[in-house]
Amino acid sequence: MANVESMIVEEKTQVKQIDREKTCPMLLRVFCSTGRHHSVSEYMFGNVPTNELQIYTWQDATLHELTSLVRDVNPDTRKKGTYFDFAVVYPNFRSNHFQMREIGVTCTGQKGIDDNKTLAQAKFSIGDFLDISITPPNRLPPTARRQRPY
């Protein structure tokens, strides 16, 4: 009987390099909350949560880069060990509702596997929102997410 081997290969999608000098940035609407994500119902019927942060950036922006931008405007998040759990809030046109999909976690002062993930790799589309759950270092970090097939 022959031995059977299997290998799990994680393929990284190639991100097309954007010339930030020649390409106009997009408006990224970011909503931060401490300890949890906003409820999807807060994005319904043209409403959004009140604590909006507007960032002009490009599709090749990494989660680490976005973490740095949020830390620049929010001094409470600069402490080492602060977790940033990113999620994309996007419209589901079939059901006329919004849905939320977690895309990665970063931590201040620590390197992580999601640090170099870009908005393009997370399948972010212009018009989507970015919802960030910020967990201070004195609380437990976000629980491990189950692996999703997308």
UniProtKB/Swiss-Prot annotation:
Involved in the tethering of the SIN3 complex to core histone proteins. Interacts with bicoid (bcd) to repress transcription of bicoid target genes in the anterior tip of the embryo; a process known as retraction. Interacts with Trl and binds to Polycomb response elements at the bithorax complex. May contribute to the regulation of other homeotic gene expressions. The lineage of its organism: Eukaryota, Metazoa, Ecdysozoa, Arthropoda, Hexapoda. Pfam families: SAP18. Forms a complex with SIN3 and histone deacetylase. Interacts with the N-terminal residues of TRL. Interacts with BCD; in vitro and yeast cells. GO terms for biological process: heterochromatin formation; negative regulation of DNA-templated transcription. This is Histone deacetylase complex subunit SAP18. It is found in: Nucleus; Cytoplasm. Belongs to the SAP18 family. GO terms for molecular function: DNA-binding transcription factor binding; transcription corepressor activity. One of its GO terms (cellular component) is cytoplasm. InterPro entries: Hist_deAcase_cplx_SAP18 (IPR017250), SAP18 (IPR010516), SAP18_sf (IPR042534). Signal peptide: none annotated. Keywords: Cytoplasm, Developmental protein, Nucleus, Repressor, Transcription, Transcription regulation.
